[in-house]
Amino acid sequence: MMGLLKELEINYDLDTIEDYLTHFNIMNASLDKLIVNLSRDDKFQSNSLELNRIFHNIKTASQYLELSPIVKLSAIAEDITDRLKSNRTTGVKASNELIDWLLLVADQLQGYLDDIENDEIYLRILNPKIIAIPNEIFN
């Protein structure tokens, strides 16, 4: 069995893979702070926009490399953050339930990135808690 990284290197240009991993790392590194600050009404608007952009970019880049689990997870997170950023109510904040869920998503994405970089054969299984998408996304 061939590892994920080796498989990507065979199917895609090496520069493309390196760019993907570099950008994925940079975007993922900023997620936790952006997510936690969704609880602050002064940061909510800018952070929900930035999170939406990051999840969109991860999704798009992962589609190109046919990394389906990453595409699916980032697409769900993009949809949720799309709902967040479209709420223009003054003083609105994200619910604790949503913040906890987004932190799980960020951990899962970091795990996927680690799996690729460590040349694992498969991407890890999805944390089952992620399946329970929060009903209440606003506080």
Where are these regions (language model features)?
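Non-catalytic helical tethers at domain boundaries
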Residues: 1-139
